[in-house]
Design a protein with these regions (language model features):
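N-terminal nucleophile
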Residues: 1-188
Length: 188
């Protein structure tokens, strides 16, 4: 798993994504997956030409063998050609990866509104947030959520960068599926 978090700030939106990729070996007789290691070289954030940020967690390949990054990039190209709204783009992205084991988050500013859209694997509905959101290994994040919510209020993007790095590191200390370092992207 991984962790992607977004915070809506007074002057923009900040998104963090860890780098951890979990490596599995599949037992050919049972189909059971076993963790064999980790690598910290996987980028989970993509900035679009329309200045939106898309984050994803889950497997790097869909059930049909396609790479998730390739599917997302192709969906973005179509979305930009058609000039889709953030909501329509997100719905299209979900339709492209729905059969995999992935979750998505997309942030952007549209009509002066700061928007965070979240879809967890298996959800029927999209969550629309005004404050922020998280996808991935959010179970480990739950113990920090009340402190995080207090610290998050009325932040500017510069402060939110340090806040997301701090919580990413804290959560990484509790679960091996999250790297202690994370990449940051900002929309203003």
């Amino acid at each position: 798993m991984s962790l992607v978090m977004a915070v809506v700030c007074t002057d923009g939106i900040v998104v963090s994504g860890d780098f951890r990729k979990t490596e599995f070996k599949v037992n050919p007789q049972t189909g059971e997956k076993r963790i064999i290691g980790f690598s910290d070289d996987s980028h989970k954030l993509i900035r679009t030409k329309s200045d939106r940020i898309i984050g994803h967690t889950g497997y790097n390949k869909l059930n049909n063998g396609e790479l998730v990054d390739t599917v997302i990039q192709n969906a973005i190209l179509l979305s930009e050609t058609l000039k889709l709204s953030i909501y329509d783009e997100f719905r299209y992205l979900i339709s492209c990866i729905r059969d995999g084991q992935n979750s998505l988050i997309e942030v952007g500013i549209e009509n002066s509104q700061k928007i965070v859209l979240v879809w967890e694997c298996g959800d029927k509905e999209i969550s629309v947030n005004q404050q922020g959101g998280a996808i991935g290994d959010t179970e480990a994040f739950k113990k920090y959520i009340s402190a995080f919510e207090k610290e998050r209020e009325n932040r500017v993007t510069e402060d939110a960068i340090a806040l997301l790095q701090k919580y990413n590191h804290l959560i990484a200390n509790e679960t091996p599926t999250i790297s202690p370092e994370c990449e940051i992207m900002v929309i203003q």
